[in-house]
């Protein structure tokens, strides 16, 4: 019985990996808000600003912000009114302005101006929750898995999880995928979600991806 259960689980892992590759093939190449920055500080701040804001908006705003405040020391000393002017295009810019300034102060005061790379230390920073910490860590090469709306929706549709709570989805996906794939899941699923913005189109492709006959063509 145990052997049979193990075989079934291994098959689920293999199918899920093939599905992940299919999602990648059905996605456009695009820069995400957390990618292609010069420092861990810039990656973290852009990740904080990207919450509930389109990447196409976040990226140019972050570029403008980092031209004015290149590091944590400079942003920590910034006036909130000046930061608000710069990041106004992002959603909830007032709250985010306060958060990224306070976050920068914490980095300067508590971490010698170096962004911590430990999950438990990251979530102590203002504006950094579980998702933001995991997305940041996965971007810098850590074995982490950030669960956002794209990851939640797609993983439920494909049967990778039956849970709706992000932290439970994270646990399920970490069980289903080998550790070396954890930091690839979020960017692949986000790109797929951003490529197929129509819910009908997205669901149609996901139904095909879920079918065994389609999977076997990989």
Describe these PLM feature segments:
Residues 167-177:
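Short, charged low-complexity linear motifs
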Residues 89, 160-164:
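Substrate-binding clefts and substrate-entry loops adjacent to catalytic sites
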Residues 44-49, 100, 104-106, 115-159, ...:
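Catalytic DNA-binding helix-loop module of base-excision-repair DNA glycosylases/AP lyases
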Residues 58, 144-148, 166, 182:
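Alpha-helix N-cap/helix-start motif
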Residues 2-121, 175-184, 188-218:
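N-terminal polyanion-binding entry modules of DNA glycosylases/AP lyases
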